[in-house]
Amino acid sequence: MSHAPFIAVIPARLASTRLPNKPLADIDGKPMVVRVAERAHQSSAARVVVATDAASVADACMQHHVEAVLTRADHASGTDRLAEVATVLGLPDDAIVVNVQGDEPLIAPTLIDNVAAHLRDHPDCAIATAAHPIHDPADVFNPNVVKVVLDAADRALLFSRAPLPWARDTWTPAVMAGSVAERPLPAMPVLRHIGIYAYRAGFLRRFPQLAAAPIEQTEQLEQLRAMWHGERIAVLTTDDAPAAGVDTPEDLTRVRAAWAELLAQDGP
């Protein structure tokens, strides 16, 4: 897959209920948001920008020579924050912007490249994202694991926290009465959505004007707003599950250990 010119933007909010000051959490001597930016710089991104509403995060980025844009504090979502950045940077409508989550310091640079290229290869779509097959029944029935089903052209038909698709002939009442671990996976692959997005800058600027969708509010999945308003989302399916992000102190401990292993394998 050839690389598409793109900009990587990392939204970073300081407020976090489960892990205060999360973007500034230390990972081997540097703030987590800086570690994410370093991973993004290992991709083919022409530019890597942190978008934050906190001066302390912007200052930390600048101390480590990471470009940062200070955005408004009243954005309802990370996508709204990206829309402001697209305007501030004066990006042309056809520019590709990849939203890299600020709490995923272990993200694979190749995944960033591939999602950007996937959007370039689907000119009929405003957004591209990624998914991978689920192999653990517990994940299928976990509402914190978002599922996606695709059409024949690998565009998203629906995202949901519910088991999707519902395997009617496999998950019989007798099977559902048993433990989750004993429920077989259906013949059709169940795909887990990976929270990375590539957007066209023109769509980003339109997004804040789109009314919230009832299904978006019910599922609490922001990407459903775009689909509700008729936008198409191209989905790249990958066999490799990405490393989990950081939401809790326990996650941070796990990621610090994984980072140390990464350094041992690849060097600093």
Curated annotation (Swiss-Prot):
EC number: 2.7.7.38
Cellular component, GO annotation: cytosol
Recorded GO MF terms: 3-deoxy-manno-octulosonate cytidylyltransferase activity
Subcellular location field: Cytoplasm
Biological process, per Gene Ontology: CMP-keto-3-deoxy-D-manno-octulosonic acid biosynthetic process; lipopolysaccharide biosynthetic process
Purpose: Activates KDO (a required 8-carbon sugar) for incorporation into bacterial lipopolysaccharide in Gram-negative bacteria.
Stated name of the protein: 3-deoxy-manno-octulosonate cytidylyltransferase
Organism: Ralstonia pickettii (strain 12J)
Gene: kdsB
